């Protein structure tokens, strides 16, 4: 995956690529454009391409981009969320995709409004050192969450073979169903078609749209 910013984004090309993805997903999933590597001055190209939903990984970048382009998009927070950043992130976003710690729950209790909705990040793969709630602990974590839990999110182990992600996506869908949750944020540039097949309702795309 690249670690350089995307410049000279062609709105027409991006619009065409978005249509390809939307058609392939049969309209079942929202396409969230991850803008971590989209500089502030290129956000207008996303708007011109018809992008409606964007996701940011860092609170500082979210604040800067939202200040200039706040009315152009719906905004989600998709990065690792530090508890001390919750207060700043909440007013700017529709959803937080990465709630996974009790320290974040404590900040949500202090600062969230009545319409706040979050997704719980689940460590479906059981990887050590990886963020996310363990599946066995999920019901209790949902019970402790002081705001509305709309669904779940996961990041499977990285693989060049999209099929390697399938069992993790299928497991997340099972967990969502058993906990009566509607939203499934899963699938990124390397494995989104598999995620769509397994029931994703939000697909997070960056690199696949811009190169």
Question: Residues of each region from the PLM?
Answer:
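Divalent-metal-activated hydrolytic enzyme cores
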Residues: 201-202
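Conserved alpha/beta-domain cores
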Residues: 1-190, 196-198, 210
């Amino acid at each position: 995956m690249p670690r350089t910013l995307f410049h000279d984004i062609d709105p027409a090309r991006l619009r065409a690529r978005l249509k390809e993805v939307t058609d392939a997903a049969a309209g079942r999933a929202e396409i969230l454009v991850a803008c971590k590597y989209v500089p502030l001055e290129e956000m207008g190209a996303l708007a011109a391409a018809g992008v409606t939903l964007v996701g940011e990984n860092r609170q500082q970048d979210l604040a800067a981009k939202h200040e200039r382009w706040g009315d152009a998009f719906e905004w989600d927070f998709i990065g690792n969320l530090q508890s001390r950043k919750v207060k700043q992130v909440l007013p700017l976003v529709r959803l937080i995709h990465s709630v996974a710690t009790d320290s974040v729950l404590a900040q949500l209790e202090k600062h969230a409004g009545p319409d706040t909705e979050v997704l719980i990040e689940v460590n479906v793969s059981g990887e050590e050192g990886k963020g996310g709630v363990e599946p066995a602990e999920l019901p209790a974590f949902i019970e402790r969450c002081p705001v509305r839990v709309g669904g779940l999110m996961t990041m499977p182990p990285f693989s060049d073979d999209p099929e390697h992600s399938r069992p993790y996506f299928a497991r997340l869908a099972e967990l969502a169903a058993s906990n009566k949750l509607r939203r499934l944020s899963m699938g990124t540039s390397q494995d989104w078609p598999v995620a769509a097949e397994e029931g994703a309702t939000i697909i997070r795309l960056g690199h696949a749209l811009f190169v």
